[in-house]
């Protein structure tokens, strides 16, 4: 089962976004929602925040709002399921070039970092493995390519980068959403 089975298809989501004049690709929108979830936003405040970031604070029309709720729910479910089902929402198919996928990946990562940053304002202070992954994501967001490159080689490299980004997103989710262990409740001795 893939996450695409639970959300509208990429082209359908693109149509909804274009109808609303949202100015984001489906990959960018998924990156933004994923970043917000991975940053620890797991309540209903994601919708107004999304509206503020993408639509000048205005709610989206019914079709797009419903599609975004499905995207949010499917993404959240995939991340909570130990991340095994979580996949980046990128264009696929024979008519999609490796360059289109590379551009979509850069957009996904940029918006993931935005979503992560609005939920974790001290992102630049994160250290350790997660801090390194965030630094790597910043570099990947600047992804560039030469159109004269061997497309087959570029496709293989792109798949490796996509998998790295997926794992980095899961690491962020684990870092920012796991329950912090609390001290066991100290029971006072009872006098009988």
UniProtKB/Swiss-Prot annotation:
Pfam families the record matches: UPF0149 (PF03695)
InterPro entries registered for this protein in UniProt: YgfB-like (IPR011978), YgfB-like_sf (IPR036255)
GO terms under cellular component: cytosol
Domain of life where this protein originates: Bacteria
Residue stretches spanning the membrane: none
SUPFAM superfamilies documented for this protein: YgfB-like
Gene3D superfamilies, sorted: YgfB uncharacterised protein family UPF0149, PF03695 (1.20.120.740)
Family membership noted in the UniProt record: Belongs to the UPF0149 family.
Name of the protein this chain belongs to: UPF0149 protein YgfB
Organism field: Salmonella typhi
């Amino acid at each position: 089962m893939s996450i695409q089975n639970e959300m509208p298809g990429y082209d359908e989501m693109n149509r909804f976004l274009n109808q609303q004049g949202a100015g984001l690709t489906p990959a960018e929108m998924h990156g933004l929602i994923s970043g917000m979830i991975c940053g620890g936003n797991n309540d209903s405040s994601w919708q107004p925040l999304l509206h503020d970031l993408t639509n000048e604070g205005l709610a989206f029309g019914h079709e797009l709002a419903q599609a975004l709720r499905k995207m949010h729910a499917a993404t959240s479910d995939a991340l909570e399921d130990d991340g095994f089902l979580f996949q980046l929402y990128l264009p696929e198919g024979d008519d999609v070039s490796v360059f289109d996928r590379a551009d979509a990946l850069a957009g996904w990562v940029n918006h993931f970092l935005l979503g992560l940053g609005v939920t974790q304002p001290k992102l630049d202070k994160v250290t350790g493995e997660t801090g390194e992954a965030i630094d790597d994501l910043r570099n990947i967001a600047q992804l560039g390519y030469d159109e004269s490159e061997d497309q087959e080689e570029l496709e293989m490299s792109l798949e490796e980068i996509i998998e790295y980004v997926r794992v980095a997103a899961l690491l962020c989710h684990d870092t920012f959403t796991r329950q912090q262990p609390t001290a066991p409740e100290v029971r006072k001795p009872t006098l009988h």
